[in-house]
From Swiss-Prot:
Pfam families reported in the protein's UniProt record: ASL_C2 (PF14698), Lyase_1 (PF00206)
Record's GO cellular component terms: cytosol
Gene3D superfamilies in UniProt: Fumarase/aspartase (C-terminal domain), Fumarase/aspartase (Central domain), Fumarase/aspartase (N-terminal domain)
Enzyme class (EC, first level): lyase
Organism: Methanocorpusculum labreanum (strain ATCC 43576 / DSM 4855 / Z)
HAMAP family per UniProt: Arg_succ_lyase
InterPro entries: Arg_succ_lyase_C, Argininosuccinate_lyase, Fumarase/histidase_N, Fumarate_lyase_fam, Fumarate_lyase_N, L-Aspartase-like
Alphabetic keyword roster: Amino-acid biosynthesis, Arginine biosynthesis, Cytoplasm, Lyase
Taxonomy of the source species: Archaea, Methanobacteriati, Methanobacteriota, Stenosarchaea group, Methanomicrobia
PANTHER family the record matches: ARGININOSUCCINATE LYASE
Name used for this protein in its record: Argininosuccinate lyase
Length: 492
């Protein structure tokens, strides 16, 4: 059993294997192992610059840490008898650099600020991964929308045929939704990207450390202002989980529709075989399993958010060990989301939309009735509610032909539409879905000309977001270069 250098002074006796296993976060901490090494490097560089550690000790520690960064941590660092990766790395450093040098690394900090910093660094990386995958999904939607600006299909409310629209209009509706997800994730990044390092247990330290310097080395925008806030609060995790839950909920919605569209009684889309399975007994089956699993994954991410909120709701200031159990919820939410996004992008990119069926269904269920009511308002100055009642009654009577519409108009409004010049030919023209779509003039409507412009706008917005994402990655690379330069100046 490994000796616990942290318990050594205050506590006596050995822990049982069950206690060690129960308390250890080592498995989840694999997510932050590399971040921890970088935090240690930045901390040692700062200690040396502030003359809080001698040059020989700094060189021993940095040599060992750079070796871990290049070759990976030795397995001993992940010893499950240790409470966490931070203790594991410290023990490994003491073994590799000696007890004198290794014992100096923790000067001016606590595991509390150390873990909070590592969590923010790893969350930052995973947010960038999510954003990159989200860009790909949005691009797939924009590309398919560009192909289908004139593809007519029915729009639905309450899952009932409602009004004609275009496939581009539908696809760009989801792109807009995912664009807002992008905005939320960018916003979350700004609140993640602040440094707790140097806050120590919660009350800071009496050593003259430079928190701004370590923040700069690690790519943070600035140090957190309140040392208690820095170590005690995980609202950045809750916010990130909330954003991921919203994103996965939006993903679940489009999954649900694509599943429905792929059914034999809708036939709007044929999914690529790679994303489907067949039955073990029914040889004719083609099941949209990938979309179904993706729909289920959204429930898991929502569950991670619920668990996180429940976990932190009663925690007093400042640090509590409960927070250790928060981290796996974040990692799992990222894992489910970041697997789902590229798969959904592929599914949409390879989907075959059944344009003839969509066009045929576009007029089922009197989807064009609204336009006839609008026409009566425009041409004959009939109040909209009256026109609405006329057309609604005609639908109830079974047809929107001239005789029925005229008869209902006489009954409800004491108006003869025939005498005002309405003809059967005019009604047919008004009710044609192509005419209806061209008639749309309001911003954001499915008019094909507007859809072509909307595709360009969406594409520009995506490029702008991609540039912002590139800037975030450049900032992290620049910080890494600054840290490398500082290491070189020590002449290891």
């Amino acid at each position: 059993m490994a000796k616990d250098q942290i318990r050594n002074g205050r506590l006596e006796g050995e822990r049982s294997a069950l206690i060690e296993q129960y308390l250890s976060s080592m498995e989840a901490d694999k997510q932050i192992a590399e971040s921890d090494i970088r935090v240690d490097i930045a901390h040692i560089l700062m200690l040396r610059k502030q003359n809080l550690i001698d040059g020989a000790s700094a060189k021993k520690l940095l040599t060992a840490l750079l070796g871990y960064l290049e070759n990976g941590l030795p397995e001993n660092a992940f010893d499950m008898t240790r409470e966490d990766i931070h203790a594991g790395i410290e023990a490994q450093l003491i073994a590799d650099a000696g007890s004198d040098a290794g014992g100096r690394m923790h000067l001016g900090r606590s595991r509390n600020d150390e873990v909070a910093t590592c969590l923010r660094m790893r969350t930052r990386e995973l947010l960038i991964d999510t954003l990159t995958a989200l860009f790909e999904l949005r691009q797939s939607l924009i590309s398919r929308a560009e192909e289908h600006t004139t593809t007519i299909m029915p729009g639905f409310t309450h899952l009932q045929h409602a009004q004609p629209t275009t496939l581009a209009h539908y696809l760009l509706a989801y792109e807009s939704l995912f664009a807002r997800d992008t905005s939320r994730l960018f916003d979350a990044y700004t609140r993640v990207n602040i440094s707790p390092l140097g806050s120590a247990a919660f009350a800071g330290t009496g050593f003259p450390i430079d928190r701004s310097l370590t923040a700069e080395y690690l790519g943070f925008a600035n140090p957190m202002e309140n040392s208690m806030d820095a170590v005690a609060n995980r609202d950045f995790i809750v916010e990130t989980l909330s954003d991921l839950a919203i994103l996965m909920t939006n993903i679940s919605r489009i999954c649900e529709e694509l599943i429905l569209w792929s059914t034999s009684f809708v036939k709007f889309v044929n999914l690529n075989d790679a994303y489907c399975s067949t039955s073990s007994i029914m040889p004719q089956k083609k099941n949209p399993d990938t979309l179904e699993i993706m729909r289920a994954k959204s429930a898991a991410v929502i569950g991670e958010l619920t668990a996180a909120l429940t976990l932190i709701k009663s925690l007093p200031m400042s640090y509590n060990r409960d927070l250790q159990d928060l981290n796996p919820h974040l990692w799992n939410a990222f894992r489910q989301t970041n697997m789902s996004l590229p798969l959904l992008a592929e599914i949409i990119s390879t989907a075959e939309f059944n344009v003839p069926v969509m066009k045929k269904q576009a007029v089922v269920g009197n989807t064009t009735a609204t336009e006839l009511a609008d026409f009566l308002v425009r041409e004959y100055n009939i109040p909209f509610r009256t026109a609405h009642n006329i057309v609604g009654r005609a639908v109830k009577l079974g047809s929107l032909d001239l005789d029925i519409v005229d008869s209902v108009a006489k009954e409800l409004a004491n108006i003869s539409l025939k005498e005002k010049g309405l003809t059967e030919e005019t009604i047919k023209k008004v009710l044609h879905p192509v005419t209806i779509l061209r008639q749309k003039q309001s911003f954001g409507s499915p008019n094909p000309k507007m859809m072509k412009k909307a595709v360009k706008v969406a594409d520009i917005r995506l490029v702008q977001d991609q540039v912002t994402g590139d800037i975030l990655q450049d900032q992290l690379r620049d910080a890494d270069e600054k840290m490398k330069t500082a290491i070189q100046e020590l002449d290891l």
